[in-house]
Amino acid sequence: MKARFALLAAACALLLSSLPVLAHHSFAAEYDGNKQINVTGIVTKVEWMNPHARFYVNVTGADGKVINWNFELGAIPVLLKQGWRKDSLKEGDHVSVVGNIAKDGSHSANARNVTLPDGRRVFGGSSAGDGDTK
């Protein structure tokens, strides 16, 4: 009886410990697949690290107000297969980004495609799809 209880407790602990991992990888939990954003601006910061690379872009709105957008990219191995390199984006680069905005209303998005300063359009490694935009 004690062995069965210990086994059940261990199984429950394992199951519960995996929930944060599942939540982390849920595009639908954080981003709205039906709401795209298409912006152009200046890169202010690049974070090339796992589990997902990120970059930040200052975008000037029609009212002249500058908003700093936070864009999530895919995992580093996925980005490397898509042609990304650690130095593909640098602070000061002028880029265009198509992505899906965060559900929480913040200035965050999952980058689907990024047009780099040299004109190359690269897939952002989004878990939302293959990079095709609507």
Model-derived regions: residue spans:
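Bacterial N-terminal signal peptides that target proteins for export
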Residues: 1-9
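Bacterial N-terminal signal peptides
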Residues: 9-20
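Short boundary/loop segments of OB/S1/cold-shock single-stranded nucleic-acid-binding domains
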Residues: 22-37
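Conserved hydrophobic positions within beta-strands
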Residues: 41-43
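Short aromatic-glycine-enriched beta-strand elements
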Residues: 49-59
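Short, structured beta-strand/loop micro-motifs enriched in basic residues and often containing a Trp
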Residues: 73-81
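Short nucleic-acid-contacting surface segments enriched for D/E, G, S/T with interspersed K/R
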Residues: 81-96
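OB-fold/S1-family single-stranded nucleic acid-binding modules
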Residues: 102-126
